[in-house]
Amino acid sequence: MLNFFAAAPKGFEYSLAQELTEFGATEIKESVAGVYFTAPLTLAYRITLWTRLASRIVLVIYKGPCESAEQLYNAAYCIDWSAHFSNRNTFSIDFHGTGGFINNTQFGALKIKDAIVDRFRDDGDARPNVARIDADIKVDAHFRNGVITIAMNFSGPSLHQRGYRSTTGEAPLKENLAANMLVRSGWKAAPTTLLDPFCGSGTVLIEAALMAADIAPGLQRNRFGFEHWRRHDKATWHEIVEEAKARASLGVKRCEVKFYGSDIDSRLVALAKRNAQNAGVLELIEFNVANALNVEPPAAEGYLITNPPYGERLGSVSELLQLYYQLGDKFKKEFGGWKVAMLCSDIELISALKLKADKQMKMFNGALECAFNLYTLHAQSTRRDTPVLPEGVDIADIAPAFANRIKKNAKQFEKWAQKEGIDSYRLYDADIPEYNVAVDKYLDYVVVQEYMAPASIPEAVTKRRLSDVLLALPAAIGVDPHKIIMKTRERQKGTNQYQKLDERKLELITTEYGAKFKLNLTGYLDTGLFLDHRLTRRLVGQKSKGRRVLNLFSYTGSASVHAALGGAKSVTTVDMSNTYLAWAKENFALNNLSGKQYEFVQADCLQWIRDCNEQYDLIFIDPPTFSNSKRMEDSFDVQRDHVNLLGMLIKLLSPNGELVFSNNKRKFKMDTETLTKMKIKVQNIDDMTLPLDYKRNPHIHNTWLITHADK
């Protein structure tokens, strides 16, 4: 009997152990990401050819304690390597694990390599050569918890590579993952009609057809790890392969199970057909180009097993939620009598099905943890957490309180925005506490920002509520799901103030009281325009005529644009970020503003204020609540440091000048007593600067008009 370890993705251990038991292996023991077993050579060959779940099978040669480099060397040296391969063969070492005396895997691999070479030499043979690529013999070594396992790669390249895939589609599903889906769903135990409406390159259907037609998954592989092993029994292996070929030929002819696959992408369907042809099962599968929402059940009952689209692509969340919701509705109405098994990494999407799962399991698609849910669809299958919707009922009814509120807001603000001369505004700001989001409209796009939920609310609850918001929006306000962009806003912390989100850009031009501004809806958490400061910017513009204007912490320079359009004599725009200064220059260009009177300065604003000797007639400053940027020498806290800041700024203010000071700290308290002693006059102007669309959130910012006290 020989000792083996069958490696597999995490979550496969139970299924793999069952498969090995069915093969007739003994001493089966589940481990992390694999299963140990014993088998005679003939059975090991058969398992290697027929396993549908294992990624790799290794022959365990040594396993024992290892607490030093010397012990590691001795463990490898004690093996009679010449009994396993010739010195004419090349070999490589694949070492996994660190800890204790092993600081890196290269050190461990080198020790084993030295031991192998020395053992050949000491036995009177020439040393074999190491080959980094395509070695004849691959030695696998694993070090964990003071135990070293030394093995030989028996199966060769990863067993999920069946040999039938020509090229992969986007986000391909590994073959052994598809096989495990078929096993855990219960389909393999009782093969029946199978449908995959998101078939992609056909992996689930092809793996199922291989099972139903009794075709060995390794039959088309042209390389195995044992081929250069000295104990390899070519005659026995040939006999096993020939037997598998005969079974495959007969199995295809006898197979009565029906397979149906479709995908909306014709290129993927063509690829699926090529893969099925390569696998020898094309005649068993009916492929079509179709939208999954239009696919009808091909039989009264069967299995629908699929891996629908999911992912984190910014802007796609609402579209995907709509898809999943409609899928759940279709399953409920049209697939009574069917079983559904679905693999998805996003619990929000799964919850959008609104169906109760019979069983929920975890599987890994590569490094991505996924949910694998099983559903039984009865003729009167009902949705979970929501009543069955009668035909024609608005989808927004899944979150009626939210839908009704935002519909009402949209009706109110649309007329107001047209009258104001703006096309970007806030529609909803956590009006209903359960739906803790902000919804902003930018032309015909909508940006949804999720606020950080209290720790007392379970994550599943917040995700479900967010899912309902995104599902309700299209019908509630008439927005295209493609044009809903999802962002997550957390409590502002230092340099996260302008957090970069995505390299891709979705840029628009918005209009505000005659000024034009560039927006980037996907590149950053913020879009380039703080909507709550709309009236503050207009106020700056109204006060700018003939004045020297300074804009500090300028961001994308929108207040500077209003100042310039308002007739400012000069405008100086200061920000620490070159990116935002470049953006500010673009905004000036959009408004046909150019000239030497417009200056853009990249600098630490606090240091720039200390060094400045100029005076200005109008200063606008909207500093961060807190900042500890690497470019700043000291941290800044607006509550702690505002008196010192205003004391420096008042020196830059001309005798009749005005300073507009704003910040977003909700519990900010102006130290008027100290400022009065400094002969600084402060006047709160929140009522003047709070737009109608932010009246529900009066603490969104604090704004003050500041002058010299003797004026």
From Swiss-Prot:
This is Ribosomal RNA large subunit methyltransferase K/L. Residues 43-154 form the THUMP domain. Keywords: Cytoplasm, Methyltransferase, RNA-binding, rRNA processing, S-adenosyl-L-methionine, Transferase. It is found in: Cytoplasm. PANTHER family: RIBOSOMAL RNA LARGE SUBUNIT METHYLTRANSFERASE K/L, RIBOSOMAL RNA LARGE SUBUNIT METHYLTRANSFERASE K_L. Its main location: cytoplasm. One of its GO terms (cellular component) is cytoplasm. Specifically methylates the guanine in position 2445 (m2G2445) and the guanine in position 2069 (m7G2069) of 23S rRNA. InterPro entries: 23SrRNA_methyltr_KL (IPR017244), DNA_methylase_N6_adenine_CS (IPR002052), RlmKL-like_Mtase (IPR000241), RlmKL-like_Mtase_CS (IPR053943), RlmL_1st (IPR054170), SAM-dep_methyl-trfase (IPR019614), SAM-dependent_MTases_sf (IPR029063), THUMP_dom (IPR004114). It catalyses: guanosine(2445) in 23S rRNA + S-adenosyl-L-methionine = N(2)-methylguanosine(2445) in 23S rRNA + S-adenosyl-L-homocysteine + H(+); guanosine(2069) in 23S rRNA + S-adenosyl-L-methionine = N(2)-methylguanosine(2069) in 23S rRNA + S-adenosyl-L-homocysteine + H(+). One of its GO terms (molecular function) is RNA binding. CDD domains: AdoMet_MTases, THUMP_AdoMetMT. Belongs to the methyltransferase superfamily. RlmKL family. Its EC number is 2.1.1.173, 2.1.1.264.
